[in-house]
């Protein structure tokens, strides 16, 4: 890494997850990691694997995913951004490129992550909305959604709403923000936490929708949170979920296992 021009680059990227089998490289299927590594390889990148802030499942999108790569690049960060975007497929885009210290780790240095989930209320399926939102009809009661969302704020054992990637792994997470907003044709959920369990965001959305529809009580949700007993929840569809932003406060946090949403 001592050669002139070699530096660690932080990439902020966005992608439409619809036609990807998730972010992580796996076999011959199309993934965000495989596309980005192939493109970086054309620009002289030689590492074995890219590092990402968080893993996203098949069909999940991102508007603020973070990756790092070490590259011997003789031009500006802006030029690298342009060179990558000229070569990447239409459903992936690099929004920003900057150099970071060699020790920077996109996952372990993240202080929190923020996910958004979009629901639209229409009696008939809208093809132009379907890639990025979950259609629910009749419309949900926003007040009930907000009532349920507040329960999740704070430090809790979320084992009823997701699982650790490793057996016996820590299932305690701290949620800083959990709230719903009305949109023109539905609502949007925003959640920020220090980290997430496997499928945690989509399970939380599903449970809140069930409560808003009268399928479960607030007591059921509180009990699930207090006792870690699964509510046997389903999963909200991947298409409504976006990894919106990864926050860094300059401190390295404890190394929680990777989460997938």
What kind of feature is each model-predicted range?
Residues 2-261:
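Structured-RNA-binding interfaces characteristic of tRNA pseudouridine synthases
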């Amino acid at each position: 890494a001592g050669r002139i021009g070699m530096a660690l680059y932080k990439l902020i990227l966005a992608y439409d997850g619809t036609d990807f089998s998730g972010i992580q490289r796996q076999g011959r299927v199309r993934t965000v990691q495989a596309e980005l590594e192939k493109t970086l390889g054309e620009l002289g990148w030689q590492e074995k694997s890219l590092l990402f802030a968080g893993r996203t499942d098949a069909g999940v999108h991102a508007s603020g995913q973070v990756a790092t790569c070490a590259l011997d690049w003789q031009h500006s960060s802006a030029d690298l951004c342009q060179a990558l975007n000229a070569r990447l497929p239409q459903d992936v885009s690099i929004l920003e490129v900057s150099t970071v210290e060699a020790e920077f780790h996109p996952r372990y240095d993240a202080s929190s992550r923020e996910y958004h989930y979009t629901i639209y209320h229409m009696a008939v399926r809208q093809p132009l909305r379907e890639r990025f939102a979950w259609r629910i009809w009749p419309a949900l009661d926003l007040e009930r959604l907000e009532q349920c969302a507040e329960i999740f704020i704070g430090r809790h054992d979320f084992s009823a709403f997701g699982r650790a990637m490793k057996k016996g792994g820590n299932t305690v997470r701290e949620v800083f923000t959990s709230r719903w907003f009305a949109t023109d044709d539905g609502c949007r959920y925003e959640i920020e936490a220090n980290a997430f369990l496997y499928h945690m965001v989509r399970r939380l959305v599903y449970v809140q929708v069930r409560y808003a529809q009268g399928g479960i009580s607030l007591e059921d949700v509180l009990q699930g949170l207090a006792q870690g007993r699964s509510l046997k929840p389903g999963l909200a569809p991947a298409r409504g979920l976006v990894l919106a932003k990864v926050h860094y406060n300059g401190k390295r946090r404890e190394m929680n296992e990777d989460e997938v949403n």
